[in-house]
Curated annotation (Swiss-Prot):
It comes from the Archaea. InterPro entries: DUF166. It comes from Methanocaldococcus jannaschii (strain ATCC 43067 / DSM 2661 / JAL-1 / JCM 10045 / NBRC 100440). This is Uncharacterized protein MJ0838. To M.jannaschii MJ0575. Pfam families: DUF166.
Amino acid sequence: MKVAILTDGVYGDRAYNTIKSKFPCDFITVKYYGDFDEITISENTIEKLKDYDLFITYTLNPDLTYELVRKIKELNNKAFVLVGAWKGEGFKKQIESFGNAFCPYLMCDIDEDELKDYKDYLDNYPHLKEFLKYFGKPKVKLYIKNNKIEKIDVLREAPCGSTSETLKEFVGREFNDKTLIDIGLRVQHFCRAGKIRLFVEKEGKKTKAGKILVSGIQVIQIP
């Protein structure tokens, strides 16, 4: 399976560095000109859209994101697109209407349960299912010995790599009631999700990312 990170130059580097540890992965800066309905993607980029099984877009221009998803649907009907940067429920519905794309609220909140209402995605795009074995909603085993964190086993990593970056700091530390709270707070330092939008969101994405990581931790006591 081949993965491509599509960016317009700002985000996506950490996802690339994380995902390439499991799958062949390329980082592609999309060249384009124009705006709104007049977006034109460079021929060089368009040719590359034929070569991958899974795309993750970190393009901040919504018109560019729309055109990328449309082109991928047209040129590569076996490929799936995870849209890592988007705003607005209307835009989400528009993108997902192509049938080959999903706009998660957070990239670290994707698993098969999250996609239960999108069963066709998992059935029709086996590469998405394969990706979710290793990346998406964090799944971690935390081994405790003599009341200290002895070892951490990351079974599924947040695509940005924040799971491992956070937890490696806690190896050897004492484990108590406050430890999980500290983990949930610390991951926010590594999280690249946007800040809370006042009067629109009740909870910021970074705060939610912390809760997601903690909820995915299984604590195992070892002799």
